[in-house]
Regions:
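Internal nucleotide-binding/catalytic subdomain
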Residues: 84-192, 199-201
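A short beta-strand motif that forms the metal-chelation/ATP-contact edge
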Residues: 128, 204-213
Length: 221
């Protein structure tokens, strides 16, 4: 977890903090990040709903359909996440999300996101750099996971030209949106970002999340 309040305090004492406190805060909050990516920037994502109670989660899961994935708005490394295959498992998913969440400023109850389980082919990470020279995307990085645990990465990954074009467009657009938010807060928005993407079995690419750092999957040499 990133202490965004400490980043903000440091930014008041020095010329610049990278990543900016505003960008780090957005990336740590799945609700703010998904609203920015999909609702403001128009990037493709899985169908989703947000919920602040068990009843809202039941309603959201019914809308996105089963199977679905439930995640705390604020968590990392898969903590609190679960795949829900029927309405009977919703209560357990809610409990899992509450136990796996980070400390949240709304009190004892943490909000969650419930999203459809996409027909995933593989995942990609696009390292994207924002600096005074502009925004640059690196060659996408392939990754392999086992039972939800990250195992290995390789760069460049093998994919079609169409997937490459989609991946680079989504990564650049997402980081441009984050930089705009940082600039609106008086920050420059520079940094290295790990943009995580889903590639579906039909070849389409969906936005997943952004880390305000290279991300574990981006640690290639």
């Amino acid at each position: 977890a990133i202490a965004t309040s400490e980043l903000a305090a440091a930014a008041e004492r020095v010329a610049q903090v990278v990543p900016s406190a505003e960008i780090a805060a957005i990336c740590m909050d799945r609700e703010r990040l998904r609203v920015l990516a999909h609702e403001e920037l128009g990037l493709p994502t899985t169908p989703y709903r947000f919920a602040g109670s068990l009843e809202e989660l039941r309603e959201g899961a019914q809308i996105v359909g089963y199977p679905c994935v439930v995640k705390p708005i604020m968590s990392s490394s898969g903590h609190g996440q679960s795949v829900v295959r029927s309405a009977e498992a919703i209560d357990a998913a809610w409990t899992e999300a509450q136990e796996g969440r980070r400390a949240h400023d709304e009190g004892d109850v943490s909000r969650v996101i419930v999203e459809a389980l996409a027909p995933l082919d593989y995942e990609l990470t696009v390292l994207t750099v924002s600096s005074s020279a502009g925004i640059v995307t690196c060659a996408p990085i392939g990754q392999r996971q086992e039972s939800g645990d990250y195992r290995e990465s390789w760069q460049p990954a093998t994919f079609t030209p169409d997937v490459l074009e989609q991946a680079q467009h989504i990564a650049r657009t997402a980081v441009e949106g984050l930089v705009a938010k940082a600039k609106a807060s008086g920050e420059k928005g520079w940094g290295v970002f790990g943009v995580e993407l889903f590639v579906l079995t039909d070849g389409s690419v969906l936005f997943n999340e952004v880390s305000p750092r290279p991300h574990d999957t981006g640690m290639v040499t």
